[in-house]
Amino acid sequence: MAGAFAFAQSLPVAITFNGQPLEVGGARTLADALDASGFDPRPGDLVAVDGSVLEAGKGEPFHAAVNGQVVSDLNRTLANGDVVEMGDGSPTEEPSDIVEEAIPYTISSEGGGAIHLLEGQGADGLRQIKTGRISGIVAEATVREPQNVTRRNVSPDVGDEKVVALTFDDGPWHDTTVEVLDVLRDHGAKATFFTVGSRIEGEGIDLVKRAASEGHQICTHTYTHASGSGKGVNLGFMAPDEQTAEIEQGFAAIENAIGGEASHIIRTPGGNYGDEVMRAIGPKVSAEIGWDIDSQDWRRPGSAAIANQIKSAWPGAIILMHDGGGDRSQTVEALKDALPYLKEQGYRFVTIDELMSYPLA
């Protein structure tokens, strides 16, 4: 029995070597197959991190696969029916020290409209910097390209429809918001309120509830109007986590008041929506809203001057006003003058959501 087994072990095996049938005797290893085939693989080179040759023939001695599995041991035993593919060795890169660093994604801007949309994933890429331990050569390679962002500044194409969007910032504000809501109700006008979240408490909750129940859109203008490190005007002065908190807390204040999900359309304090702000809060918002017409009511130039700004509206325009931040009695009086005038011209007053339902370009 033992003799028969030994005899069987000494028989050659039939394999396929680089597409050709081949009998392999001896120990029936990959080395034996290489000898029997007459194939003489050329070893690869030892190369630097930049691909230049350091030593010819000092790389991978050969490249082989048995039945599709890569093999580097010439003592691998073969069996009948094995399929062997063998070729020249590949270059071997010198050992190196590796440092990885992010490639920041970029934000480009196109268009001049007051509705600001972000397109793109906004993900950093990855760069690898290798320093060869033998050569001392430094080589850089991009492992992952950044996924850049485009800020599209668009306007609604309202065609022949005379629609405008009235927007109010910095409320809710005790008497003023009530008066603004009364004027809007009296003229069948809808508006969008960009609220300061910290003011949505007590009476502020009731005012937001009333505005929502009367068909107005409630959006955030941040939680504190970027107070503190934002100096009350620019989220970009704040750390990214502070910016995110301003938006998330603003959403939460609205949701607490209305009992439903807050709109993710926002307006930043001062309309400051630069790259550093877009990077921090862009993923959390669906659109940032600027304005086409600044009523200048924050300057308190008189109700007539404010009314004239409002009356200058054109189809699709977004008008900036304030129901909070101080005495807005001039704004209330201006609305009483301007809204009837615009209605006589055939205008309707819509929310930002309604305005954005038109084609945007």
State where each predicted segment sits.
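Active-site beta->alpha N-cap acidic-glycine motif
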Residues: 134-235, 246-249, 253, 257, ...
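Soluble periplasmic/extracytoplasmic beta-strand elements of cell-envelope proteins
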Residues: 14-16, 83-87, 165-167, 192, ...
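Anion (oxyanion) recognition and catalysis
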Residues: 35, 185, 212, 282, ...
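Solvent-exposed coil/turn segments that connect beta secondary-structure elements
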Residues: 69, 83, 89-91, 198, ...
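Short phosphate-binding/catalytic loops that engage adenosine nucleotides
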Residues: 39, 189, 216, 286, ...
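Ubiquitin-like/PB1-type beta-grasp interaction modules and other compact soluble beta-rich domains
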Residues: 1-102
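N-terminal pre-catalytic segment of deacetylase/amide-hydrolase enzymes
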Residues: 54-56, 73-74, 79-165, 174-178, ...
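Catalytic domains of cell-wall/extracellular-matrix polysaccharide-remodeling enzymes
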Residues: 179, 201-206, 225-348, 353-361
